[in-house]
Every structure is written in C-alpha cells, then in structure tokens.
C-alpha cells in the first residue's frame, strides 16, 4: 500500500470560513497558532464540524485490494476515481503462469492476507483470470471472475469532516485489517500542521 497526498486546502481557508460567522478576521494569523486554536475549538470541541468541510484532501492510493475498495466506497462525501478494470485488465495477458505457493510473484497483483489456504485460493483465481484473458473474451465480461484480493488504485478527495469519520471508524481494531492500515496511512500522509484536527479520532487499541 502506498499513499501520496496530492493536494490539501490551507488551514487559512478553514479559519477564514470559521471567522466569517463572527466577522473576526482581524484576529486571524494566516493559518498560524491562533487560527489552529480556532479550528480545533469550533470544529472539534464545540462540534461545529461543518466548518471543517472547507478543508479538502486529495490522496493517490495504490495497492489496496478490491475488497478494501468496497469498504472505502461505503463512506459518503468522498470523490473516488478508480483504476478501471475495463481498460487495464489486459495487463495480465502477457504474464506467465501464476503458480500455487509463489506468493512473491502473485503479490504484484494481489493483496495477500497471510493465510496460506486463502492466499493460494486467490492465486488460483488469478491464474483462472489470466487464462480467460488469453481467449477472445471482452474485459467487461472477464472481470466478473476477478478475485477480491486483486490490487487496485484510486485518487480520493475527501473533506476533513468525512476524514475524521473515516479514521474514527476504520482505525478501530474491529475494522478490516487492510482498511485499518489505510486509515492510519492516510493520517500519516497528512501535513504535520493538519494532524491536530484528526489525532482524537485515532484508535490506540491496535495490536
């Protein structure tokens, strides 16, 4: 899994939006400590979380499974652009046979869970897909036999309020292990000066 932060809204935009309510612009410091305190107090402590929606983040997320992607898609107020299997499954056509037990080779296309029986079943499904792609079957039809562990990538834009919800729910040990890793990786990818907005959302119970 690889996370790249492509864009983030400056804190000064959020503080300006917040100060609009009280017309207290003269008290701002262009995203400095005064503005950070205001954002934390109004958005987090006073729970006026709509002010946090002025902050947007765009991440490039690579190497998550389609199973994890389904979990991500359940979250509202996000804008995902996902790698299309319709146009990209042809990447498998020139591959050699994927053999049971060859986890290193299969991991180029699959997210492996560490359970040998499950991972070998995923490799078998990957090989079945590769075989089908050798035939004159359209990618639109062939993709129906994609294993859930097949790697994908997406560009995801999400506002701070929604990201708080995502991190709060998905960093919990009760979440799917892969999306738990994703939630923590998204937090780590944030600009250091933005992390104060999300620190209280992180679960500390990860083993």
Swiss-Prot record:
Its EC number is 2.1.1.148. DUMP binds at residues 71-74, 84-86, 143, 170. CDD domains: ThyX. It catalyses: dUMP + (6R)-5,10-methylene-5,6,7,8-tetrahydrofolate + NADPH + H(+) = dTMP + (6S)-5,6,7,8-tetrahydrofolate + NADP(+). A motif (ThyX motif) lies at residues 74-84. Keywords: FAD, Flavoprotein, Methyltransferase, NADP, Nucleotide biosynthesis, Transferase. Binds 4 FAD per tetramer. Each FAD binding site is formed by three monomers. SUPFAM superfamilies: Thymidylate synthase-complementing protein Thy1. The keyword Transferase applies. FAD binds at residues 50, 74-76, 159-161, 165. Its cofactor is FAD. It holds the Pfam family Thy1. The active site is at 170 (involved in ionization of n3 of dump, leading to its activation). One of its GO terms (biological process) is dTTP biosynthetic process. Residues 1-204 form the ThyX domain. The keyword Transferase applies. GO terms for molecular function: flavin adenine dinucleotide binding; NADPH binding; thymidylate synthase (FAD) activity; thymidylate synthase activity. Pathway: Pyrimidine metabolism; dTTP biosynthesis. Homotetramer. HAMAP family: ThyX. Catalyzes the reductive methylation of 2'-deoxyuridine-5'-monophosphate (dUMP) to 2'-deoxythymidine-5'-monophosphate (dTMP) while utilizing 5,10-methylenetetrahydrofolate (mTHF) as the methyl donor, and NADPH and FADH(2) as the reductant. Belongs to the thymidylate synthase ThyX family. This is Flavin-dependent thymidylate synthase. It comes from Campylobacter jejuni subsp. jejuni serotype O:2 (strain ATCC 700819 / NCTC 11168). The lineage of its organism: Bacteria, Pseudomonadati, Campylobacterota, Epsilonproteobacteria, Campylobacterales.
């Amino acid at each position: 899994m690889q996370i790249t932060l492509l864009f983030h809204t400056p804190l000064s935009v959020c503080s300006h939006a917040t100060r609009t309510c009280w017309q207290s612009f003269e008290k701002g410091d262009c995203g400095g400590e005064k503005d950070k305190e205001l954002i934390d107090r109004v958005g987090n402590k006073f729970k006026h979380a709509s002010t946090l929606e002025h902050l947007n983040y765009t991440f490039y997320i690579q190497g998550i499974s389609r199973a994890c992607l389904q979990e991500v898609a359940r979250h509202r107020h996000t804008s995902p652009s996902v790698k299309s299997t319709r146009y990209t499954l042809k990447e498998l056509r020139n591959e050699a046979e994927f053999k049971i037990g060859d986890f290193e080779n299969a991991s180029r296309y699959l997210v492996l869970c560490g359970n040998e029986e499950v991972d070998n079943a995923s490799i078998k499904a990957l090989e079945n897909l590769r075989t089908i792609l050798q035939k004159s079957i359209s990618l639109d039809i062939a993709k129906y036999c994609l294993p859930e562990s097949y790697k994908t990538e997406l560009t995801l834009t999400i506002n701070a309020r929604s990201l708080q919800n995502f991190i709060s729910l998905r960093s919990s040990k009760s979440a799917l292990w892969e999306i738990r890793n994703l939630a923590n990786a998204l937090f780590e990818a944030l600009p250091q000066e933005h992390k104060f907005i999300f620190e209280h959302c992180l679960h500390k119970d990860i083993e």
